[in-house]
């Protein structure tokens, strides 16, 4: 079973408008709410691909009750850790041309006791996890080494980990050598404090992040695909077909989920990278924040090209 942790879940309000233009009005075409957060999104993809998954997240307030209602209809197992404060609400606004903006709240302040309960819950499921996916931002009150502690605990039990995080918590977790990390371009730029513009930049970034402690690095590059620096020292590139992207937000979550799903079936990182890029690309073709089915992803997978750079 693939276990996902969403340390800072949300109710996602996804709004589609006719067009997004700076300092001009836009008309709402549709709106919907859903359970959100990187780990929850990953569990949605894994479930759509026919695999078992358990989603773990804190949950509090009226928004937390709504989160539980949404998760109950998702078709996968979940375990919620009760917290006092209201979980956050995030908003995504996208137009029909693929332009999108995401507005995120910081999330609820967690007490030390609540943080301890959340950590204990994840630790209890490590032994049964084929892959724990540690995903997203940490809410206020959660120490920056939270993911690092979980990766350390998993490593002691011989459990492989995938980290999809940003900022200080990403940096701190690298010291514990996560098996795979999946930063996007902006997250890699923040970590390395440099702008990445060219293929050489992407390759150098992936290699540098691997050198900081990650076993393998999958650098998500949106419409350009992904660059991977693997544990054996090889560098891979995966390029998707050209598609009309309606909403790229959430594509990175789909990539991380499909990468872990593929490795669980077949320990071939080349094939996993191909599936990951296919899942991200197929999901970006859908309106709003949506995730492609296995059949939709397979159609794109057949057109993703991979090659070894080094």
Question: Model-found features: residue ranges?
Answer:
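Conserved phosphate/ATP/ADP-binding segment of small-molecule kinases
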Residues: 144-234
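Glycine-rich phosphate/adenosyl-contacting loop at the front of the ribokinase-like
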Residues: 1-56, 64-66, 244, 310
